[in-house]
């Protein structure tokens, strides 16, 4: 009998989230425990999510029932950089509905978070997973696990046909697909298949719950929110990226060394990524713009600093699939180490089904606007256009034409 792609509970545990939310949460506990933040949900393609409001609220109530078991805490304790005080805090942590507001505004589903960063930070990934799975239950109720599994094996067949054995031996792929997964059961099934049958190197998952369950490595370092928040955390705006990186280094002392470059733009980031940081961090992560051009820029930066690029790693995570990953791998092979984090294309790619296109992003920190500009015009996000203009001015980022009106 074929198995349904859905289960009653969408979020399985407090660990059913991306690993970098926990690594950032620990840094927030130690450095910014009293800072307030605001987040807003946005459905990028205008899909009507209003009919799902009541069920989304019910799943949020279930989310707030979760706590970490002794087994969960024991798993985290084995991770060397998770500190005892953070483990004690997590043992007491519960999601609190006072910090999340759901409503219908202007005929759209509205989700807002407002509260202490320390207590709000873990909401993002499970909330997105809830919206995605509730919507999929209604739109595609008869979906079976076998459909997702067969699709993944088709991708493996393509990869083994188009890549050599030597290439496959070096091709490193990880799952980054929790937030927009079709369902929990689909992600769980996909990870089992990837662990056992992926023809290249399957190196782990960002999902901590499934890493524990399937004996995989949990992966992740920092997200845009870490750098965005520092725009309002005390230093001059021009020094905000440096402050974010410096705080990370003090927290992790050389561990978790993959830095995200495109919060403002990669050019602005590399201006701040001097020899000190370039030596301390293991590598960089790409999340917008042309991946090969970005990689060339990073390689050139390392070479100018006298650093061998082959001692560093570039992680790619922007809308990838296996053909794109293989193209990037071939363009950079032997010049710098590369790894690929694939999300929606692994956990929400089922024939005939359109995955969600949505984000839940930090909009304010300490009562003031924050922004992400990125290397791609369509990914710029801020509720205050004046702050975006000021950010561009301070970091000397030129205005770019919108994707709807190319120059």
From Swiss-Prot:
Query: Does this UniProt record's set of keywords contain Phosphoprotein?
Result: yes
Q: Which domain of life is it from?
A: Bacteria
Q: What post-translational events are described? A: Transiently phosphorylated on a His residue during the reaction cycle. Phosphorylation strongly increases the affinity for substrates and increases the rate of nicotinate D-ribonucleotide production. Dephosphorylation regenerates the low-affinity form of the enzyme, leading to product release.
The broad enzyme category this protein falls into is ligase
A single GO BP annotation from the record? NAD biosynthetic process via the salvage pathway
Cite the EC number: 6.3.4.21
| Phosphohistidine sites (modified residues) | 224
Keyword set includes Metal-binding: no
Which pathway or pathways does this protein act in? Cofactor biosynthesis; NAD(+) biosynthesis; nicotinate D-ribonucleotide from nicotinate: step 1/1
CC per GO annotation: cytosol
Molecular-function GO terms, alphabetical:
nicotinate phosphoribosyltransferase activity
> What HAMAP family does this protein's entry cite?
NAPRTase
NCBIfam families for this protein: NAPRTase, PRK05321.1
Q: What is this protein called?
A: Nicotinate phosphoribosyltransferase
Q: Please name the source species.
A: Pseudomonas savastanoi pv. phaseolicola (strain 1448A / Race 6)
UniProt gene name: pncB
